[in-house]
Regions:
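Penicillin-recognizing serine hydrolase domain
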Residues: 87-252
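Active-site-adjacent loops and short helices of periplasmic peptidoglycan-processing enzymes
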Residues: 1-126, 135-136
Length: 252
């Protein structure tokens, strides 16, 4: 089922799926340690970007950065991967656009690693599907995307470790439905993009399905007690309803 699949849209943090793809293409050793620099985190607070909480001088592994990128949607993780793998963010973004073109994402152009708004940073639902189909084939990506919680081991800056939690899997039991459960995904938001969501569900028969949505408007009424947002929760429940309908149809 496709609706408005070729309409131009701003992807917000769904961008970070491609950031992860390109990073994994360039990572030879997930356990290699790097040191977070000032340039990895500069400007992020001013841009109101979502971050994992990494600090300059902190030593973490490239695997830690992937979790920081995907679970809390950390722009600091995105920029650190770009700077340390490709030497600079612009160099990394060039690889992102090259990778997108190679995957057949013909209506996509990215200008940053994070999804922060830029008029020249755009894609389509159809291209996002191509991106996610490619990413999901990578075992390392699937492992990160389906993780609920992860703790970066203790550092000088975080003596008790840095605890990370998935923005999507936060809803935990709400992700289960009679025919299966939502096992992973990525959410995103900017005022210009609206609320965006990629989710993947596994049915009881083992088959997997994907739902992608974008441009959802903000809901003022609070639907969740803590964390997340009403609209993000609504997006997740809409996806759950679609998966439930698929499961019901399969059981007929």
């Amino acid at each position: 089922m496709k609706k408005n699949s070729d309409d131009k849209l701003f992807p917000a943090s769904l961008t970070k799926v491609l950031t992860a793809i390109v990073a994994l293409d360039n990572i030879e050793n997930l356990h290699k340690k790097i040191t977070i620099s000032e340039k990895d985190i500069e400007g992020l607070a001013e841009a109101n970007a979502s971050v994992a909480g990494l600090e300059a001088g902190e030593q973490v592994t490239l695997e830690d950065l992937l979790y920081a990128l995907i679970l809390p949607s950390g722009a600091d993780g995105a920029n650190a991967l770009a700077n340390h793998l490709n030497g600079s963010i612009p160099n990394f973004v060039k690889d992102m656009n090259k990778k997108a073109a190679g995957m057949g994402m013909l209506h996509t152009h990215f200008t940053n690693t994070t999804g922060l708004h830029d008029k020249q940073h755009y894609t389509t639902l159809q291209d996002i599907k191509k991106m996610m189909d490619h990413a999901w084939k990578n075992p390392a990506f699937r492992k990160v995307m389906t993780t609920l919680r992860y703790t970066i081991p203790a550092t000088k800056q975080h003596p008790n470790g840095l605890k990370l939690e998935s923005t999507l899997l936060f809803y935990d039991d709400d992700l289960k439905f009679s025919g299966g459960e939502i096992i992973g995904g990525k959410s995103g938001f900017t005022p210009e993009a609206g609320y965006c969501l990629i989710s993947v569900a596994r049915m009881k028969d083992g088959q997997q399905y994907m739902v992608i949505s974008a441009k959802a408007k903000k809901i003022e009424k609070t639907l969740v007690e803590e964390g997340g947002s009403a609209t993000e929760y609504g997006n997740v429940m809409d996806a759950k309803a679609i998966y439930t309908a698929i499961a019901d149809e399969k059981n007929k």
